[in-house]
């Protein structure tokens, strides 16, 4: 009898969680352009049936927003949540108000070429494409630059390269 009661309570909790998830819509404010696009891409990993007004969901949204901004050089955003009542015939709206903060700027790059790599045309050409001083750090561009260095090293037999 006790097991049946526990099963009923558990089922009720699961059903009520799904019902509340269906009644909440997530809205992000304060971003535009590439920042908004990248944050939306991070948030797209969250299924619509997982959207709830609880703190655990807010923490997940907070993490996704931070990851989306970090990739584009914004490491200290401010994120505030506001749960608004539903419009006339709608769902509750969980609003994430985002202020991206100050971006990380590239202060310098230090690429040291040794041996034959110092005069290698492919390396010298690649160095012209490195992230410029004073520009906003873009994690994707930085990783692509590193991959290009590694690719040239492997292709030309420079096996002592390191980062």
Annotate each PLM feature.
Residues 1-11:
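Bacterial N-terminal signal peptides that target proteins for export
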Residues 12-21:
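Hydrophobic h-region of N-terminal signal peptides that target proteins for export
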Residues 21-163:
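Interaction-mediating elements
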């Amino acid at each position: 009898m006790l097991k049946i009661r526990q099963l009923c309570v558990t089922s009720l909790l699961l059903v009520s969680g799904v019902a509340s998830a269906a009644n909440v819509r997530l809205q992000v404010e304060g971003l535009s352009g590439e920042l908004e696009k990248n944050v939306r891409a991070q948030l797209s990993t969250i299924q619509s049936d997982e959207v709830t007004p609880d703190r655990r969901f807010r923490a997940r949204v907070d993490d996704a927003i931070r990851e989306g901004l970090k990739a584009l050089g914004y490491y200290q955003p401010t994120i505030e949540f506001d749960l608004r009542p539903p419009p006339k015939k709608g769902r509750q709206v969980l609003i994430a108000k985002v202020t991206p903060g100050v971006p990380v700027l590239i202060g310098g790059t230090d690429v040291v070429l040794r041996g034959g790599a110092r005069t290698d045309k492919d390396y010298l050409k690649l160095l012209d494409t490195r992230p410029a001083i004073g520009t906003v750090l873009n994690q994707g561009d930085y990783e692509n630059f590193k991959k290009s260095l590694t690719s040239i090293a492997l292709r030309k037999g420079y096996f002592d390269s390191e980062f």
